[in-house]
């Protein structure tokens, strides 16, 4: 099995492997501001930067200088640019939207965009969720073989039955 790493700045040290059949290879460097997730679109990789709301493109193994999208996100706690998935040329993003980077949250939202190979265009709101907590906001996004999009929204810090414990604790 080959694991690819995307190195962020600043580096906190080299990866340490505990499995003999894993190989770590440096794929790209220079991604700042907390990459949270990535999606593969053909031979390209779209990478989310949590704190500044940018979506960066890795094309032919090279991190492109300009972002393909820059959204206003709040980045307090675990908020920010959180999840990405693709269906054909549609790209779905999940993030905590704000009026400006680092501002107060307007909501946790899912948007769809069209990917033209260069930039993300035609932004459409798909789902508007609550944004009451700065932690436990989820972020994982996947698609099934039929093109349906699934999203982990987290428990927003609301413990109890959400944890699937019979006694609610």
Sequence positions of predicted segments:
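Bacterial N-terminal signal peptides
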Residues: 1-7
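Sec/Tat signal peptide C-region and signal peptidase I cleavage site
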Residues: 9-13
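A short helix->beta-strand "capping" segment at the edge of beta-propeller domains
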Residues: 14-32, 123
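Surface loop/turn motifs at the tips and blade-to-blade linkers of beta-strand repeat domains
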Residues: 26-32, 68-76, 127-133
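Surface loops at the rim/top face of extracytoplasmic beta-rich domains
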Residues: 40, 46-53, 77, 90-169
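Beta-propeller domains
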Residues: 46-68
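Blade-loop segments of beta-propeller domains
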Residues: 63-88
